[in-house]
A protein has these predicted regions:
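Juxtamembrane membrane-water interface segments immediately C-terminal to a transmembrane helix
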Residues: 35-57
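Interfacial alpha-helical end/capping and short helix-turn segments at domain and membrane boundaries
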Residues: 50-202
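Membrane-embedded hydrophobic alpha-helical segments
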Residues: 1-40
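N-terminal cationic amphipathic segment used for targeting or macromolecule association
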Residues: 15, 20-23, 46, 187, ...
C-alpha cells in the first residue's frame, strides 16, 4: 500500500513536471516570437529612416546646388535644369519605394515626409515642363514674322516665365523645410545625415 502511494506521488510529480515544462516552453516560444517580431519591425523602421534620410538629404543638397547655379549665368540654363532633373529623379526613387514609408511608426513624421515630397514634386514638374515649353516658344518667335503673332507669343512667354519663377520660389521655400524632417529621422535611423551636407560643402 505504501509502495502504491509513493508510486502515485511519483507519477503525479512527473505529470506536473511535464505540464510545467510544456507551459514554460509555450511561454518561451511566444516570447521569442514577440521579440523576433519587435526586432524585425525595429530593423525595418531603422532601414526606412535611413532610406528617407538619404533621399531627403540628397534632395536638399541638389536643390541648394541648383539655386547656387541659377544665380550664375543663364538662370534656367543646362546645368541648373540638370540639377532640377536630378532632384526629380530622387522623387522617382521615393515613388518606387513609397510603401516603405509605412515602416515608420511615427504617423506625424510619415505625414510630414509625404506632404513635403508631394509639395516638391508638383512645382518641380511644372518648372521642368515650363522650361521646355518656353524653349519651343522662343524658337517659334524667331521664325515668326507676323507682328500680331509675335506680340501674342511674347506675352505668352512673359506670362510663362512669371509662372515658372513662382514655381521655382515655391520649391526653394519648401526645400527649406527638408532639414527639420531629416533631423526628425536621425534618432530613428541611429545615424546623422550631416555627412552628405558636409561633403557637399567641402
Amino acid at each position: 500500500m505504501v509502495v502504491d502511494t509513493f508510486g502515485f506521488l511519483t507519477d503525479q510529480s512527473t505529470l506536473i513536471a511535464v505540464v510545467l515544462g510544456a507551459i514554460l516552453a509555450t511561454i518561451g516560444g511566444f516570447t521569442a516570437t514577440v521579440l523576433e517580431r519587435y526586432l524585425d519591425k525595429r530593423e525595418r523602421e531603422q532601414n526606412a529612416a535611413l532610406f528617407f534620410g538619404e533621399i531627403l538629404s540628397s534632395m536638399a543638397v541638389i536643390l541648394r546646388f541648383a539655386d547656387e547655379t541659377k544665380k550664375i549665368g543663364e538662370p534656367y540654363g543646362p546645368v541648373t535644369m540638370r540639377m532640377l532633373r536630378s532632384a526629380r529623379s530622387e522623387l522617382d526613387i521615393y515613388d518606387r519605394n513609397r510603401e516603405t514609408l509605412f515602416d515608420l511608426r511615427d504617423a506625424d513624421l510619415r505625414a510630414r515626409i509625404q506632404t513635403l515630397l508631394i509639395r516638391l514634386s508638383m512645382p518641380l514638374d511644372g518648372v521642368i515642363e515650363a522650361t521646355e515649353e518656353l524653349k519651343a516658344m522662343r524658337v517659334q518667335l524667331k521664325a515668326q514674322r507676323d507682328p500680331d503673332e509675335r506680340a501674342e507669343l511674347e506675352a505668352r512667354i512673359k506670362a510663362d516665365e512669371i509662372r515658372r519663377e513662382g514655381g521655382y520660389e515655391f520649391i526653394v521655400n519648401t526645400a527649406a523645410q527638408l532639414k527639420s524632417v531629416i533631423t526628425g529621422l536621425e534618432p530613428v535611423a541611429g545615424h546623422s545625415f550631416d555627412r552628405i551636407d558636409k561633403i557637399a560643402r567641402s
